[in-house]
Amino acid sequence: LSFLTIHLLMSSPRLEKLQAFLSASPDDPFLLFAVAKEYESLKDTQEALAYYLAIRAKQPAYVGLYYHLGKLYEQLSQPQQAWEAYTAGMEVAKLARDQHALGELAGARLNLGDEEDFT
């Protein structure tokens, strides 16, 4: 664990509890997502990104991931990666027949720019 991670764990009882749950269920996408969101709230974008990418690697069908991953990439000034996250999420949402998520992802991608900007 890095010094920053240890400091954040000490300053965030919620993060400490989530990490304890996660140690018992390391592949649980909901817990991974909750930890990522907690790191985001603590302004540790790199740790948040690492957890989002862990979800994508372990549970790529977790549709809730892609909108937040894309938004984080936007925050990190990585629009190409944001575009790719939204596009991948749209495919996952289509397969899951999740029209609400599909609409949110399509809207986020549209707000990012035109397809010609990213393909």
Predicted regions and their residues:
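Residue at a conserved register position within TPR or TPR-like alpha-solenoid repeats
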Residues: 39, 73, 106-109, 113
